[in-house]
Amino acid sequence: VAPTMYAYQIIEAIKIAKKRGLNIPIIYNSNGYENIETIKNLKGYIDVYLPDLKYYSNELAIKYSKAPEYFNIATSAIKEMIEQVGCPEFDENGIIKKGVIVRHLVLPNHIQNSKNILKWFKENLEGKAYISVMAQYFPTYKAREDNLLNRKINKKEYSEIEKYLFILDIENGYMQDLGEHEEEYVPDF
């Protein structure tokens, strides 16, 4: 689910809500594959961006999401998001008030993709954004038929990513627990 197609309506809704007294951080949850002009138009309306950064490899992006130039498009959008809202700031309860948290979903059999994403984050965004490494992948629809994606990630794979995160010494990040991510919590699209 992505808000992109409703960006202009979202801007108008935010204007109305703020006129009526809304005073909470506005969060934009994004798949990351965003038109840079759309993101630029959101300047001043969004406090927290939560973009996905799924693929380092253009080959994977095309194969699994039919998203050519995914990495270049997503990282350009993420850099614009950071330019708009700056470094993350948190309230006294640890709740984010403004900033960017880049989310990366680890895919089974594609550990190098995740390592490349983490390395890029360290070299380009460390200190400017947070990263959230997610373990919740499970196969649905056609992924069940793909020999590389037809299972959840395993402990060995996730442990390798966790170790790499520590080797890179990424300080501003989160790692989701590798637990049971029950499919009954996922909508049946």
Region annotations inferred by a language model:
Residues 91-94, 100, 142-172:
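Conserved N-terminal glycine/acidic-rich loop preference
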Residues 1-147:
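Conserved AdoMet/S-adenosylmethionine-binding subsite of the radical SAM
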Residues 177-189:
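Radical SAM enzyme core and accessory elements
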Residues 51, 131, 165, 173-176:
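Conserved, mostly hydrophobic/aromatic
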